[in-house]
């Protein structure tokens, strides 16, 4: 099953997507960083994360190495693997990989475009309901973008 964005989005150029990923201030509010921000943005996108199985690796040290080991093992067993890590070494799209290769700049820009629009829609709905707009952090935006 493949995923497609449930609404039209303005596709950003790569350079603009990188700029927005570094500074999410224009789509953010002042509700503070909350887990619900990412959940509501994914809900707005009709849960792209439900189209594949995920492994989350958490902890203080060694997350990227452990993630890469896991992706390599799973890929060696014939499974298609995507990887989302941080930080990047040189280019922001290095945070997102598919089958061991960084996503193309256009794919990165598409993910950021979809995440930005989802955040805008969620915050508009919150504002209309008299609720504080979510603070959408760069990490929130990129986490949602990686799922698209």
Description of each model-found segment:
Residues 62-63, 89:
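Short active-site-proximal "capping" loops at secondary-structure junctions
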Residues 35, 40-43, 48-50, 76-148:
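ATP-dependent carboxylate-amine ligase catalytic core
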Residues 1-59, 66-79, 83-84, 124-133:
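Short functional linear segments
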